[in-house]
Amino acid sequence: MSFRAPNLIRSAAGRRASQTLNLRSQVIRRRFATEGGPEITKPSSPRSSNTRYLLAGVGIAAVGAAYYFYGTGRTAHDSANKADTVVRGAVATVEAKTGLRRGKDEYQKVYNRIAETLEKEGYDDGSLAPVLLRLAWHSSGTYNKEDGTGGSNFATMRFKPEAEHSANNGLHVAREHMEKIKQEFPWISYGDLWTLGGVCAVQESGGPTIPWRPGRIDGFEAQVTPDGRLPDASQAQDHLRFIFNRMGFNDQEIVALSGAHAMGRCHTNRSGFEGPWTFSPVTFSNQYFALLRDEPWQWKKWTGPAQYEDKNTKTLMMLPTDMALLKDKSFKKYVDIYADNEEKFFSDFAKAFSKLIELGVPERQWAGEPWTLGTSD
């Protein structure tokens, strides 16, 4: 379908759009600097084909911005935010098409810097890796395949409404830590930074190599997802399937991703639950599955929410959603596989986690196949 306007209207609209886009370009540049939007690094001698892509992308962004500003009946603030999102998406697409995006070596430097800062004396078990893994997981696990909302693309946990979702309690620790990394590498988007932090957390803690690639853009508060999209630890297997199927995961992937509980612990002042899942909560392994299956468990007698404790030491915990993996025949099949075969767990987790942290990102924003980034060893 084509759209045509009388000459007088086109002329007026053109002047108004030109004035607005000049103003918007100033705002957009400021927002790119302060909100982690992608930058274009100008090559010394760009190829003509790259230039054509760049000009086409800028033209598309301008048309989109003008349309959102004038054609949707939104408030000026909402329209401006939408225009910025259109431009950022166009920039990411142009970068992907032209090879203007920063290379693997630049992102390896960010990875290395994160790795250097993982150890933190006095925090939990001496490492920030578990909470960085949780940040990557929770910032991606809001995806809804039905309408394409949520996921890692807009890093909307930066905004108060999503930051205050009960499932995200305590993640201010991870966000504040990663903000320091962001100050050192202001060109990286928050979505790329947070997911890269999760990859680093797993790999530096003895886990598998996670395929990862850049391309996420930062959004606005209007793109915050509704509360309730992340798993509720007090629920059972039907809830797990509802949450994970909404993102596009099957039973095997549900169990594999649950293996992230190999790391970290719960806190009464965050989730209400208390304790670690394993005896080595800063090491990524298949110990979670072995303990879940082989240890005797009982209900913990305390005033907090219902959770399990191991009968032998009473120092470990499992959540109702963890125990659901044993009670459901389909889930338990994979618990047994992963408890007996760490290599298989690592392989399946790497695939599922890489899929998780790419949810919500349009294919056109990727520049190519995922990379594997080296560990600090």
From Swiss-Prot:
Reactions mediated catalytically: 2 Fe(II)-[cytochrome c] + H2O2 + 2 H(+) = 2 Fe(III)-[cytochrome c] + 2 H2O
PROSITE patterns: PEROXIDASE_1, PEROXIDASE_2, PEROXIDASE_4
SUPFAM superfamilies: Heme-dependent peroxidases
Active-site residues from the entry: H138 (proton acceptor), W277 (tryptophan radical intermediate)
Transit peptide: 1-17
Site description Transition state stabilizer, residues in chain: R134
Positions that bind heme b: H261
Cofactor: heme b
EC number(s) given by UniProt: 1.11.1.5
InterPro entries to which the protein is assigned, alphabetical: Ccp1-like, Haem_peroxidase, Haem_peroxidase_sf, Peroxidase_I, Peroxidases_AS, Peroxidases_heam-ligand_BS
UniProt keyword annotations, A-Z: Heme, Iron, Metal-binding, Mitochondrion, Oxidoreductase, Peroxidase, Transit peptide
Residues in coiled coil: none
Compartment(s) of residence: Mitochondrion matrix; Mitochondrion intermembrane space
UniProt cofactor note: Binds 1 heme b (iron(II)-protoporphyrin IX) group per subunit.
Subunit-structure text: Forms a one-to-one complex with cytochrome c.
Role: Destroys radicals which are normally produced within the cells and which are toxic to biological systems.
Protein name: Cytochrome c peroxidase, mitochondrial
Classification lineage: Eukaryota, Fungi, Dikarya, Basidiomycota, Agaricomycotina
